[in-house]
């Protein structure tokens, strides 16, 4: 959160540019400040942070979406994950979308309409209709 530190900082600026998201986060009884390693233990945390498995079906489409200013993962991590899906898992259809100025909660960001529209458009082109 150093990027947004200052006398008026509340410690939640990393989530979103929308102050309503900070208020909702603070009010959520399921929110925790416990680090993931401590919360889940080393084995489960490694699964969250680890590399993707090998030998997925090659035609499984993957969409990775991230805010450019997300201090948790950010574009660098997402591009690395996309590369791992291609090289390690053998996937052939991996799409990454990076949202300028967006932070961690891209679906609760100021440009959430764009984020949702991109997701729906991607689903329309990658998931066949039922029935």
Give residue spans per PLM region.
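A general structural detector for well-ordered alpha-helical segments in enzyme core domains, enriched
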Residues: 81-84, 115
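Surface-exposed acidic, glycine-flexible loop patches that form ligand/cofactor-binding
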Residues: 51-57, 128-130
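Catalytic active-site module of serine/aspartate enzymes centered on a nucleophile-bearing elbow/loop
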Residues: 88-131
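Short beta-strand/loop motif that positions the catalytic acidic residue
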Residues: 58, 64-66, 70
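Alpha/beta-hydrolase-fold enzymes
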Residues: 1-35
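Conserved alpha/beta-hydrolase "acid-adjacent" motif
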Residues: 71-80
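Short, conserved loop/helix-junction motifs that constitute active-site signature segments
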Residues: 54-58, 87-90
């Amino acid at each position: 959160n150093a990027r947004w530190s200052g006398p008026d900082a509340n410690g939640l600026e990393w989530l979103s540019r929308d102050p309503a998201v900070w208020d909702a986060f603070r009010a959520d009884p399921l929110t925790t400040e416990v680090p993931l390693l401590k919360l889940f233990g080393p084995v489960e945390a490694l699964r969250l942070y680890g590399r993707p498995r090998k030998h997925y079906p090659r035609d499984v489409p993957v969409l990775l979406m991230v805010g450019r200013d997300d201090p948790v993962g950010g574009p660098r991590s997402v591009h690395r994950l996309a590369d791992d899906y291609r090289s390690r898992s053998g996937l052939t259809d991996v799409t990454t979308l990076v949202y300028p100025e967006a932070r961690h909660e891209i679906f609760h960001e100021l440009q959430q309409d764009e984020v949702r529209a991109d997701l729906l458009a991607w689903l329309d082109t990658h998931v066949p209709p039922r029935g």
